[in-house]
Amino acid sequence: MGLMIFAYIAIGAVLGAGTGYLLHRYVSAKRIGDANELAKRIVEEARKEAQAQKKEILLQGQDEIFNQKRELENEFKERERELKARDRKLEEQGERLEEKLEKATQKEHEVLAIEKELTRKERRLATLEEELEGKIAEQDHRLEEVSGLTAEEARARIMEEVEARTRHESAKMIRVIEMEARETADRKAKEILASAIQRYAGDYVGEQTVTAVTLPSEDMKGRIIGREGRNIRALEAATGVDLIIDDTPETVILSAYSPLRRQVAKMALERLIQDGRIHPARIEDIVRKCEQELEVQVREVGEQATFDAGVHGIHPDIIKLLGQLRYRTSFSQNVLQHSLEVSALCGMMAAELGMDIKKAKRAGLLHDIGKAVDHEVEGPHALIGADIAKKYGEGKDIIHAIAAHHEDQPPKTALAVLVQAADSISGARPGARKELLENYVKRLEDLENIATGFEGVSKVYAIQAGREIRVMVNSENVDDDQTYMLCKDIAAKIEKNLTYPGQIRVTVIRERRAVGYAK
């Protein structure tokens, strides 16, 4: 029984093993078949994809070839059009050249015909000239026989007569032209000057060489003088100004030719009086502060002057020098006010003449800038001013106008002459500058004495406040030519021996009277 069970188990195991083996073989075979089918499908799909890519590449290549072919065809057509256009242009040019050639040929024929005609006329003219020369020679021979002169002698006499007549007529014409030009120029100049003078109406107050400072009481004079005069000596030493105390009640007079120093002294004295502490150390401190304040005021005055004149872009150092001109005088005329006046006159006259108004105003404003430092630098103030203008970058025309306004250099530009004229107008107008009566009388006497010293002078009159001198000469001793030379000599001697503002007109008068009696 147990054996049978074991046998059954063994048989079952064998059958199970066989069945498992067969089942394994079946499963393995199925897997291999599936793998083969999968491989075939992959290969087929790869082949199809390769065929598709091949077709796509072929299509792209065909499209690219087609596009390139189309571009080449378009380019070929464009070249063909250009060549046809060029051919048409060449044909047109050829036709034009043929027309020009035909015209040139026609003109050549015409020129040849004209040359032939000219040659014929030249031959005819030569024949006529020969005949004319023969007749002229015959006439000359007859004239020589009749007049008793050779042809050369007659020609020389005729030339002398023609030359004399021509010289006389040309001299007369030149005198007329010069007279008309001089009259026109004088009239125009007077109109321009009169217009400028009438249009300018600036205020003017004569400058003094003293300044008065009012004191609160007479006792203040003793405090200003100080013990043994130490305060007044310290103030005079610090400012360079003379203090006059005893002349006027409750007033101190500051005397100095420098308005700048007088202004510093006035500011310092007023501040000391207000402060009440007056001693040498305090005086020096106050004077130093007043000098610093005045420097600021000087710059402000210069800036205001450029604003009033309408001139811009001036170097700051020149503006400071302009401010210093406020404290300079010339014949009691304030130099800054004079410069503003010259600037305005230059602008007005430049407008009348069609010149640059801004440049004229600038030259007029800066023309006396050298007076701000002429006490520190040697030389004429005009040349000093020109050097200053050159140093700070002013234009050549401005520099020359400054240098030439007193003829330290000969004026070479219209602007220089314009500044000269405006400077003379500002300084020479009545009341602009003051002179002492004795100096004025002496100058007139010197003028008359200079002219009287020349030979042939009978009477001399200095008129127009010494700005014109009229000289009467003896007509029997001095002729017209000598009158002209005498006028030049008197003017030259006045320039050499006298110093004066502006200019002096010299007029020499020669009068000849003829008296007859009818009986």
Curated annotation (Swiss-Prot):
Residues covered by the HD domain: 335-428
Origin superkingdom: Bacteria
Domain (KH) ranges: 209-272
Membrane topology value: Single-pass membrane protein
Physiological role: Endoribonuclease that initiates mRNA decay.
PANTHER family, per database record: RIBONUCLEASE Y
The name this protein goes by in its record: Ribonuclease Y
Species assigned in the record: Nitratidesulfovibrio vulgaris (strain ATCC 29579 / DSM 644 / CCUG 34227 / NCIMB 8303 / VKM B-1760 / Hildenborough) (Desulfovibrio vulgaris)
